[in-house]
Amino acid sequence: EKFPVRDPFFLMIRRSLNTFMNAFTAADWTAYPFATQNKKDFQNLLSVYLDAAFSANLNPLDFAQEGIRIELENGQPVYKGVVFNEMKGAMSAPSDQLYHQLAHHLFPETTYHYNSGGDPKDIPDLTYEQLVEFYKTHYHPSNAVFMTFGNQTAYELQEQFEKLALHKFTAGTTLYSKPEKRLTAPVEVTETYAVDGDELKDKTYHVLSWLLPQASDIKLRLGMRLVEGVLLENSASPLRHYLETCGYAQSTGPLMGVDDSNFEMTFYCGVQGSNPEHAESFRDGVLNVLREVAAKPIDSSLVDAILHQIELHQREINGDGTPYGLSLILNGLSGAIHHNDPIQIWDVDSAIAQVKEELQDPMWLSNLIQTHLLDNPHRVQMTLVPDATKSAKEQEAEKARLAAIGEKLTEEDKAEIIAKTKALQERQDTPDNLELLPKVGLEDVPADLHIVQGQLREIICNRMDTPLNLYHAGTNGIYYQQVLIQIPDDVVKSPYFNLLSILMGEVGAGEYDYLELQNLQTAVSGGLGMGASLRSKVDDKDKISAWLTLTTKSLTQKFDAIHLLKLAFEQLRFDEKERIIELLQQRKTRWQSRLSGAGHSYAMQIASRNMSALAQRDYQNTGLGALNWLGELVTKITQDDAAYDALIAELKHIHTKLLQAPKQFLLVCEEHQSERLVEEIQNVWDKLNVDTAATELTQVEQENDNEHEAWLIQTNVQFCASAYQAVEVSHPDAAPLMVLAAYLRNGFLHSAIREKGGAYGGGASYDGNACSFRFFSYRDPRLAETFKDFEASVQWLLNTEQQPHQLEEAILGLVASMDKPGSPAGEAITACYALLHARTPTFRRTLRERLLHVTLEDLQRVARQYLIEQT
């Protein structure tokens, strides 16, 4: 109404300093969250969001673009639409097919029965009139929930809600979720999912699911969280242990534990990498474990350990991905939507007090397992089996449907379709009047980049002075401790190096086997981790800055996590053969199942693999070829003892080299706790058992790949990428290249690839680690045409008149992402890692300053130099 533009959401992303903007659709709610640190920006976004939500212009041509339409190609009808293609891509993932097919049976009648994103085979049935009717019924204040977090008062905000949107409405109908009709006996079903190729062995999923009572019962909700912890928290937990070691599956499944986000709770457990004939063994095995656990009291120390995890999770201030306030809002949203009190979800102290009272009865948790799992008839077992013909059948069904439509089309119908297609193209080509929308400008950008400052201390590690990076932060009673180890060059390039991080904390250490170590971690820490922080050198693309990170966190009264981290690394055990093979098998299976969601990342990685030392290393160690290598390795070590022994020898060599390598420490905590924690770290790490003998690593021959490649994965859409050699991040041209990527995305690629091409997403990016400039598309129905659009975007920049606001918008988005706040601990850890990789505060501020001063001439110059002249 107030902002009659075609796409207020994408246009406001560019005209804002937002730290988060998105829209989420669930089975019984849709949310429109946004966040910003700038008050003017908040007012702008609030006014546009309220106008879009409550006074939407639902243009039938926009429905055709975003939802579904028919166009004619060579005189024959074809389906097009952004969401249609998005859901084709989303439903390619086996985990999505598993969830939606299971929900279909677990919820026979309620809204959860349906795929809220839209099943691709049903989307063509949706009409514009149905969309408008749905909007009128649901998008009414009587059916809305407003949640805010920040320093504006509730009164002030409510006044704005009223003034900007709500005053024009009268009372409407409030919609309520309904309880599901309960099954009177368990159900067993078999469904299929699409796979490529004829090899169907070890590709079946088994899952058991139960429908539980309403999530509004806060005590039961926490009780079932404890049940989940007892059964599934770690590899020593009885149900997870059974599923990981059952012998008929390669890994636990993607659906595990309690889901309390719906009106009624559910409990899941399952396996993947299995075969159909094991369905009965799976069901009987799970039920036997549940019977064994429910038959006796649960060890109180185990319950205390799970309560420790709940307290740790409750205390932790996150916000490194989604802003902290929005995380809280989204956690409480399902409660509020279902007319419950979200404060009970955020503040679990009262629920913990109630639960502790119930725990006076040693059989309380055991009885919950008996009542809500064993004696609960609303149970669905699903066997999801691979079908190599399913994709072809779905495509044939779509073709047959379109052919039937085509046969009935009269010349008049065809003329109408052509006219609508032309009208949509004209609408897409007509620039919006941006003056209608509010904006912030470069004058609203903070003058300086906020960077957390730490202290550099020294402690004794292995009788040597060793740096300790200390950061004081408001961590709400939690400390974060890390060991940072400079990774030798031969180690970082070894494909075996990544395997070591899979083992750390998951195999035994010292006198503890892996089951004992798992339980210890749950009792005293938020887990133990090993990872790698890798960057290209700021001024040399042929060198890698590489640090190993050993990580833990815990409540400040639990120092044992510091001891446990050292033990798990220093005395990591390589003698648990079955466990090690099991962990590598799990990694391979989970990696395979996640491919279709990250196709654009793999495409960009492949395209830029030879443009820096780090790009080459990442492609060889984490790319699609590395997945094939891991699969072959798992097969070899399972069948051949000598191959297994060779693997362990290699891992031991890498472990020794890392023990020998130079170290630093990182501690993030509240100031009043720091001296005790520093002292404890020194006491623990003073003596380190290091084998000083030199070790040599095996050189693994890497294949020399082609310049142009296509990889086939199981999906009904494409992920396209082109890459061009660019410069190191310290080069003055890095800033213009960053702005160029945003400029081309906003000004050309979004329209060409998403709006006109029908892909769910697309754009460009400069990658300072790969030292490359990359174009990409995501869930894209096209192929060759998209590559032409990549090239056309450069010609558009060089050969058409450009508008000044486009440059400002591109710079604004980049600066907003640089200035985006994290959690208190996350900002400290980021600052420390930046220093390790020579991204000093001066370096970061210089880059930001360069971004703010990029000109249109700079963009045209770097586009010619890097995207045309080297082609």
Give a label for each model feature:
Residues 1-45, 51, 62, 92, ...:
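M16/MPP (pitrilysin/insulinase) zinc-metallopeptidase core fold and M16-derived inactive scaffolds
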Residues 34-79, 263-319, 334-342, 359, ...:
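M16/insulysin-pitrilysin zinc metalloprotease superfamily fold
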Residues 44-48, 52-59, 74-141, 160-164, ...:
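Scaffold signal of the M16-like zinc-metallopeptidase fold and its non-catalytic homologs
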Residues 69-75, 86, 90, 178-197, ...:
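Short, conserved secondary-structure transition motifs
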Residues 84, 88-96, 173-238, 322-343, ...:
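His/Glu-based metal-binding/catalytic segments typifying zinc-dependent metallopeptidases
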Residues 198, 254-263, 286, 471-474, ...:
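A glycine-rich, aromatic-flanked flexible loop/lid motif
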Residues 360-400:
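Extended, domain-scale alpha-helical bundle/helix-rich regions
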